[in-house]
Amino acid sequence: IIQLKDNQYPVEVTLHYIAYPKENVIKTWSEIKHAEKKPVTLWRYASTMLYFSGNEYYLTEFSSDWAKEAQMSTQPLLFGKKVIDTKLGSRAAMHTHPFFELGFEQPAQEAQGRAMLGTIGWTGNFQFTFEVDNVGNLRVIPAINPYASDYELKPNEVFTTPEFIFTFSNNGTGEASRNLHAWARNYQLKDGQGDRMTLLNNWENTYFKFNEELLAELMKEAKHLGVDMFLLDDGWFGNKHPRNSDNAGLGDWEVMRSKLPGGIPALVQSAKEAGV
C-alpha cells in the first residue's frame, strides 16, 4: 500500500498492489478521499499508472463487430498517445475489448519475447491510454472512461477504482495467458478448481433448420462423445413471426410450434433419456 497526500489540499490517494508470486500476476487499484468541507467532483480517476523504460513498444488490441469478434491487430507505439476506449455502457465490449497485450522490443509473440497482458475489472465504459513521452518511456493508464463520468465525492467518503490485473512473461504471450488463467482459477472464479461440464451447442450444426427429432439425435451423439450438456441456440421461438432467419422473430418469445410441437418439456425429456 502506498499513501499519497497533497501538500496544499486535504486530498489523499491510496495505491493498492497485491502480488501473486506463484501465478506472476499483480492486481492494483486506487482509493481516493478528501476532507474538504464540501463535496469534490472527480473528473478522472485511473486505476493505476505503469511506467516503462525501453526502446520499442508494440500494442496488440482486439476489435469486434457482429460475427467478427476479437479481430487482433498490432501496431508500434511511437511518440504521443494511443487511446483504446468505449462509450457503449453495458455493451462496452461490443466493439473493443478491455484487454491488451504489450510487446517489448518486438511485437508480442506466442512463445518468445517479453510480453505484458493486462485487463480491467470493469464491465462499463473503459479507457486505456498508452503514452510515449519525449525521452521514449511508456506510460500505461487503465481507467473508467472519464467521458460523462464525473463523480461527486463527499467529505471522508472513499472512492474505489476498478481493479487492473496484469502479468509479465519473458517467454511470450502463451506463458502470460496461462498466468492469468491460473490466477482466475485460483482466486477469481467460483469453484475455480472444480470440474467443468463440456457443452454441445447446436448452432454450427443446424443454424435455424431443426426440429425435435434432429435435436434429440444430437443429444444422443453428445452423450456418445462424452459431452455433459446440450445448449439449444437461436431459432426456437416465434409463431406470428417465426425465427427462421436473423431478420425476424426477436421479441416473439413463444416456442415455435412448427419446429417444437412438444415445447421445451419434450426437449428436456429427450435430454434426460440421452443422459445429458
For each feature predicted by the language model, list its residue ranges.
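N-terminal amphipathic alpha-helix/helix-capping segment at the start of soluble metabolic enzymes
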Residues: 153, 183-196
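Aromatic-lined carbohydrate-binding/catalytic grooves of carbohydrate-active enzymes
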Residues: 191-276
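Polysaccharide-binding surfaces and accessory modules of carbohydrate-active proteins
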Residues: 1-131, 147
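A short, polar/charged loop/turn motif at coil->beta-strand junctions and beta-hairpin connectors
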Residues: 112, 134, 192-194
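Short Pro-Gly-centered flexible turn/kink motifs
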Residues: 151-170
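Glycine-rich, aromatic-flanked loop segments that form ligand/cofactor-binding clefts
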Residues: 99-129, 168-189, 223, 227-234, ...
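Short acidic, Pro/Gly- and aromatic-enriched capping/linker segments at domain boundaries
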Residues: 134-154
